[in-house]
Amino acid sequence: MVKQLTDAFARKFYYLRLSITDVCNFRCTYCLPDGYKPRGHHSFLTLPEIRLVGRAFADLGTEKIRLTGGEPTMRRDFTDIISVIRENKLIKTLAVTTNGYRMERDIAKWKEAGLTAVNVSMDSLDPRQFHAITGQDKFFQVMRGIDAAFAVGFSKVKVNVVLMKNVNDISLSAFLHWIKDRPIQLRFIELMETGDGGEMFRQYHISGEIIRERLLLDGWHLLQRSRSDGPAQVFSHPDYQGEVGLIMPYEKNFCQSCNRLRVSSIGHLHLCLFGEQGIPLRDLLASEKQLDDLKLRIQDGLRHKRETHFLHQGDSGITPNLSVIGG
């Protein structure tokens, strides 16, 4: 039995972000403004390979898996992927990050298959601005998808907003009004510099500190984080059903509480969103007989995890855009 995943800085890893495709049907300005373009001839992880990845990480103490992309729900076998991961009772939380365009139609069957949490990208509450940011006129469809999630029994929906200067930072009041009577955790994510997005970053990056100051002045309180939570600082207010999260990767000590690893859609273990090439796992995903070797490679790979990212130096590693490793 391999012990709980722990790195050289005594950080324990309970959370896996598993990308299952690079393909996305949206053209978000900060990620894929020119649309999805295949990189090389790699095939994405198969259902049996995904099952084995899930088993290995569960045996190593992982409690939470988040399915990412690209747009993960574009896979035809997406519901089956949920089912095979949920076969493993050690995985307590199975989440998805989605652009939401298929939620209205499919959220009920995803929940039935075992999905326990959902994050939806929603960078604007204005339909025209939403269209301009995403390249898709699907604002109302995504909104109906969020309503559908509540209708089938999700008690909370997380909504991701990539914070952009003079685009949506000026809409904080509208966002707060939206969550006043809805159990939505609204998560403002600082725009991060990637290989393809340097100019976008310089033009639109703004610190989440501005929102944090406003929240604290208005009586919001910081909540305690659990060991499998993501990196958001989450705030609550007695007058609001919803919550506000801030993800601020440029803040000092952001990496100190890192609890998550990433596996890309082609089967590489990435120790950091902004790390290097990744550690190949796919040669150990052909058979369950390789499970012990797979776990040992994952464990051994953690020796190379750095204490922090180097975004402050403008080093985004090999990440050309966030669809490649899964944000």
From Swiss-Prot:
<dbReference type="GO" id="GO:0051539">
    <property type="term" value="F:4 iron, 4 sulfur cluster binding"/>
</dbReference>
<feature type="binding site">
    <location>
        <position position="258"/>
    </location>
    <ligand>
        <name>[4Fe-4S] cluster 2</name>
    </ligand>
</feature>
<feature type="binding site">
    <location>
        <position position="255"/>
    </location>
    <ligand>
        <name>[4Fe-4S] cluster 2</name>
    </ligand>
</feature>
<feature type="domain" description="Radical SAM core">
    <location>
        <begin position="8"/>
        <end position="232"/>
    </location>
</feature>
<dbReference type="InterPro" id="IPR006638">
    <property type="entry name" value="Elp3/MiaA/NifB-like_rSAM"/>
</dbReference>
<feature type="binding site">
    <location>
        <position position="31"/>
    </location>
    <ligand>
        <name>[4Fe-4S] cluster 1</name>
    </ligand>
</feature>
<feature type="binding site">
    <location>
        <position position="97"/>
    </location>
    <ligand>
        <name>GTP</name>
    </ligand>
</feature>
<dbReference type="InterPro" id="IPR050105">
    <property type="entry name" value="MoCo_biosynth_MoaA/MoaC"/>
</dbReference>
<feature type="binding site">
    <location>
        <position position="24"/>
    </location>
    <ligand>
        <name>[4Fe-4S] cluster 1</name>
    </ligand>
</feature>
<comment type="similarity">
    <text>Belongs to the radical SAM superfamily. MoaA family.</text>
</comment>
<keyword id="KW-0004">4Fe-4S</keyword>
<feature type="binding site">
    <location>
        <position position="30"/>
    </location>
    <ligand>
        <name>S-adenosyl-L-methionine</name>
    </ligand>
</feature>
<dbReference type="Pfam" id="PF06463">
    <property type="entry name" value="Mob_synth_C"/>
</dbReference>
<dbReference type="Pfam" id="PF13353">
    <property type="entry name" value="Fer4_12"/>
</dbReference>
<feature type="binding site">
    <location>
        <position position="70"/>
    </location>
    <ligand>
        <name>S-adenosyl-L-methionine</name>
    </ligand>
</feature>
<dbReference type="GO" id="GO:1904047">
    <property type="term" value="F:S-adenosyl-L-methionine binding"/>
</dbReference>
<feature type="binding site">
    <location>
        <position position="66"/>
    </location>
    <ligand>
        <name>GTP</name>
    </ligand>
</feature>
<feature type="binding site">
    <location>
        <begin position="260"/>
        <end position="262"/>
    </location>
    <ligand>
        <name>GTP</name>
    </ligand>
</feature>
<keyword id="KW-0408">Iron</keyword>
<dbReference type="InterPro" id="IPR013785">
    <property type="entry name" value="Aldolase_TIM"/>
</dbReference>
<protein>
    <recommendedName>
        <fullName>GTP 3',8-cyclase</fullName>
        <ecNumber>4.1.99.22</ecNumber>
    </recommendedName>
</protein>
<feature type="binding site">
    <location>
        <position position="121"/>
    </location>
    <ligand>
        <name>S-adenosyl-L-methionine</name>
    </ligand>
</feature>
<feature type="binding site">
    <location>
        <position position="272"/>
    </location>
    <ligand>
        <name>[4Fe-4S] cluster 2</name>
    </ligand>
</feature>
<keyword id="KW-0501">Molybdenum cofactor biosynthesis</keyword>
<feature type="binding site">
    <location>
        <position position="192"/>
    </location>
    <ligand>
        <name>S-adenosyl-L-methionine</name>
    </ligand>
</feature>
<dbReference type="GO" id="GO:0061799">
    <property type="term" value="F:cyclic pyranopterin monophosphate synthase activity"/>
</dbReference>
<dbReference type="GO" id="GO:0046872">
    <property type="term" value="F:metal ion binding"/>
</dbReference>
<dbReference type="InterPro" id="IPR000385">
    <property type="entry name" value="MoaA_NifB_PqqE_Fe-S-bd_CS"/>
</dbReference>
<dbReference type="GO" id="GO:0006777">
    <property type="term" value="P:Mo-molybdopterin cofactor biosynthetic process"/>
</dbReference>
<keyword id="KW-0456">Lyase</keyword>
<comment type="subunit">
    <text>Monomer and homodimer.</text>
</comment>
<dbReference type="InterPro" id="IPR013483">
    <property type="entry name" value="MoaA"/>
</dbReference>
<keyword id="KW-0342">GTP-binding</keyword>
<dbReference type="InterPro" id="IPR007197">
    <property type="entry name" value="rSAM"/>
</dbReference>
<feature type="binding site">
    <location>
        <position position="158"/>
    </location>
    <ligand>
        <name>GTP</name>
    </ligand>
</feature>
<keyword id="KW-0547">Nucleotide-binding</keyword>
<dbReference type="GO" id="GO:0005525">
    <property type="term" value="F:GTP binding"/>
</dbReference>
<dbReference type="InterPro" id="IPR010505">
    <property type="entry name" value="MoaA_twitch"/>
</dbReference>
<keyword id="KW-0949">S-adenosyl-L-methionine</keyword>
<keyword id="KW-0411">Iron-sulfur</keyword>
<feature type="binding site">
    <location>
        <position position="28"/>
    </location>
    <ligand>
        <name>[4Fe-4S] cluster 1</name>
    </ligand>
</feature>
<comment type="pathway">
    <text>Cofactor biosynthesis; molybdopterin biosynthesis.</text>
</comment>
